[in-house]
């Protein structure tokens, strides 16, 4: 597959860095998933050697949307409306084809009132969070219509089960096959008529987050970030971060109320099917390069060290003593890349934009850091690389290679297998949308329900029967 021609007039036109297989929205859905799985807010200088056993994850090691729900209506009451079942919603935004587009709910100081403040880092992940808020609230309204005698606690529990099941289905059958090698996924999980079985070899139990996933493999998304995005027809192309602080509208940085015309048109970020539609912006290739704007990101308040994201990722791997990519590949029994196949830089075919790891840093010959190895492995899977140069046309989709695919697939599938309430273990827990675009279209097109709402939690009816969840079976992606 020949790379698209570079248009020098705009970073947002089709160019050689784009991945024609993955729409741009999946970059930020991946970030949304990451924030659901991992959180460590302790101070970190990135240099003090740290034992993996000393790591603390403040998120549950489950795909359970605790970043959306917090500790629930009792433990995180500030996230919820007065009835204790609907989540707070933000101000309406214009500019989108979705007339119900909304900002995140915010305090009078502009702080987002959500389960994980990191989902306000940029306008795109904030928009995804807002869509899941609306999806939850619409699901609550549906449960109320179908089971009007339920107590508020029962309504919330039923709605959360439906939302989480839909989310898990999208992670497993929409997101994962776009980023990982389907052959690896099939070796880890089989789906026969809706009955899912697993074959986990790396992580037989994912009750704790694998460090290789959190610190290396799942950071591939940094390479997918585009230089510029158009969120709707009214707003010009903008970078994720411009280097300016406190000036809403010049970039897509969050942590403040969104400009009123920043409603996101999701048809620019997700396609309805496996085929990428003409107007959908594409992610950048999963390769060993990141866009310049990510080197300008502000430091987390808990961290010291360099602002450059690539350097931070490498320091974090070294701090935790992660094995090299070559060592992990050997342990998995997959082919180990030669040093001349490990390109650091853009996978465009331009030899001036990439260099072998051994030429860049001779001390890394034969022992490439796992994060960099996984990114370079993606390039070496999509293209034939010989003596530090891409040879011939693209031969495979730009997804994770054998090592990256195995770590990410086993983590996601292992998390679900370890959760007795997941869709892997509860067969009727299935969503109605097969892709994120389908879900967001459903949310956008849903008419608001005019209802009296629920009574306050302490006066809700008790003893009502639990609802039966009856969503239609999904069409599995193969």
Where is each model-derived feature located?
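Active-site nucleophile-adjacent alpha helix/oxyanion-hole segment immediately C-terminal to the catalytic cysteine
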Residues: 133-141
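Terminal regions of secretory-pathway proteins
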Residues: 1-118, 122-123, 141-478
